[in-house]
């Protein structure tokens, strides 16, 4: 069975954000507005998504 994945898209800029939030975006592999990455749906990734949920959109 294939592992479940989620698509994460950055919708807002990281300029002026907390350093931890910028680092979280980098950890998710996001670099710029409109950038989309497909990530494995794990507890660690979900925690990162929850930290920066105001800057991203999640599908799947």
From Swiss-Prot:
Keyword Magnesium attributed: no
Gene Ontology biological process terms from the UniProt entry: translation
State a GO cellular component annotated for this protein.
Answer: cytosolic large ribosomal subunit
Q: Where are the transmembrane segments?
A: none
Q: Which GO terms describe its molecular function?
A: structural constituent of ribosome
**What PROSITE patterns does this protein map onto?**
RIBOSOMAL_L30 (PS00634)
List the keywords (alphabetical): Ribonucleoprotein, Ribosomal protein
List the Pfam families: Ribosomal_L30
Quaternary structure and interacting proteins, as annotated: Part of the 50S ribosomal subunit.
Task: Give the family this protein belongs to, as stated in its UniProt record.
Answer: Belongs to the universal ribosomal protein uL30 family.
Q: What name is this protein filed under?
A: Large ribosomal subunit protein uL30
Q: Which organism is it from?
A: Idiomarina loihiensis (strain ATCC BAA-735 / DSM 15497 / L2-TR)
